[in-house]
Amino acid sequence: MPVTVRVRRVGHRGPPLDLPRYESAGAAGLDLRADEPFTLAPGERRVVPTGLALELPPGHEGQVRPRSGLAARHGVGMVNAPGTIDADYRGEVGVILVNHGQAPVAFARGDRIAQLVIAPVVRAELELVDALTDSDRGAGGFGSTGQ
């Protein structure tokens, strides 16, 4: 069932860009676009403005995820993937990109740089205990389930 996300344009770096949209009927993420042109040198990271501020419904978050095509073709990804937009954040959405490739990558204003997935949030109540219930896995981590 769709939820309403209120959007405000911020930054005013040029003519308004299209609002994020789903590019196919089955897409999970809305495409976020760069609100200014830039070039990422190899090894460089940068916070890229989107020109948008969001008002997410209570009980939801925005997950900013990398675009697989940028990673596959250019080695460009996100430093903190996924990035989290809390429901009470009202500032401009920025995307932290990094160039893991060996060549500079140029972006034009309006290029798609990330995906925004809106998801419900479950809030946990923590209970301090002296022991945890046993499980088959136990404390094995960092690849232990594939051995």
From Swiss-Prot:
Protein encoded by which gene: dut
Taxonomic superkingdom: Bacteria
Keyword Transcription belongs to the record: no
Keyword Transport: no
EC number: 3.6.1.23
Function: This enzyme is involved in nucleotide metabolism: it produces dUMP, the immediate precursor of thymidine nucleotides and it decreases the intracellular concentration of dUTP so that uracil cannot be incorporated into DNA.
Keywords noted in UniProt: Hydrolase, Magnesium, Metal-binding, Nucleotide metabolism
Family indicated by similarity: Belongs to the dUTPase family.
InterPro entries, per the entry: dUTPase (IPR008181), dUTPase-like (IPR029054), dUTPase-like_sf (IPR036157), dUTPase_trimeric (IPR033704)
UniProt name for this protein: Deoxyuridine 5'-triphosphate nucleotidohydrolase
Coiled coil residues, start to end: none
MF annotations from Gene Ontology: dUTP diphosphatase activity; magnesium ion binding
Binding-site residues for substrate, renumbered to this chain: 67-69, 80, 84-86
Reaction catalysis annotation: dUTP + H2O = dUMP + diphosphate + H(+)
GO biological process: dUMP biosynthetic process; dUTP catabolic process
Associated pathway: Pyrimidine metabolism; dUMP biosynthesis; dUMP from dCTP (dUTP route): step 2/2
Species this protein is from: Anaeromyxobacter dehalogenans (strain 2CP-C)
Cofactor(s) essential for the protein: Mg(2+)
